[in-house]
Amino acid sequence: EVIHGDPKSANVLVAAGENRAIALIDLDTVKPGLLLHDLGDCLRSCCNRLGEDGEEGEGELFAAELFQALLAGYRDAAGDLLGMADRALLVESVRLISYELGLRFFTDHLAGDRYFTVTRPAQNLHRAAVQFRLHASILRQQEPLEERLAHLFARTRPPCNCPRRGL
């Protein structure tokens, strides 16, 4: 499959005056890859209430209601691409990607901030902590998130003109 490779919220173009995404930008990362990686990363980024550089906040860091809303839109537009095996692993993929990114930020901090651009001291260390908190938030909510996902895909939906996957 062809994936975007960096589907974070900053790479989603939103229509002016509307609450609707119209395009993904920053296409230099388009490549063959796994749908779960792309969709998991998109959900990790878009459902993080604080963003990668966020400060302390109240409540769960991972927004379950955004997770459900984003997946409802995905289901209606391209849900046929997400097979049963993908759905079974989707929440786990979001959690795994948050942990992976936390490790990448932490490693970059230890290496002298060579990969991710920083504007202040210890910014990548802070970013790592945010991703690890996000990981913990997803873990605490894993069962309810899986229930939301199952409920969304149990409903009937309009047919998609997308190519079918073999899963």
Predicted regions mapped to residue ranges:
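ATP/Mg2+ or Mg2+-diphosphate-binding catalytic cores
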Residues: 100-167
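Short amphipathic alpha-helical segments and their helix-coil junctions
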Residues: 20, 24, 71-84
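Active-site activation/catalytic loop segments of kinase-like enzymes and analogous catalytic loops
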Residues: 36-79, 96-115
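Hydrophobic side chains within alpha-helical segments
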Residues: 8-11, 41, 103, 134
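Active-site acidic catalytic loop and adjacent metal/ATP-binding pocket
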Residues: 1-37, 50
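All-alpha amphipathic helical-bundle segments outside canonical DNA-binding/catalytic cores
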Residues: 82-94
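Secondary-structure capping and boundary motifs in well-ordered enzyme cores
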Residues: 4, 31, 94-99, 127
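Loop/helix-junction capping segments adjacent to catalytic residues or to phosphate/diphosphate-binding pockets
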Residues: 33, 84, 100
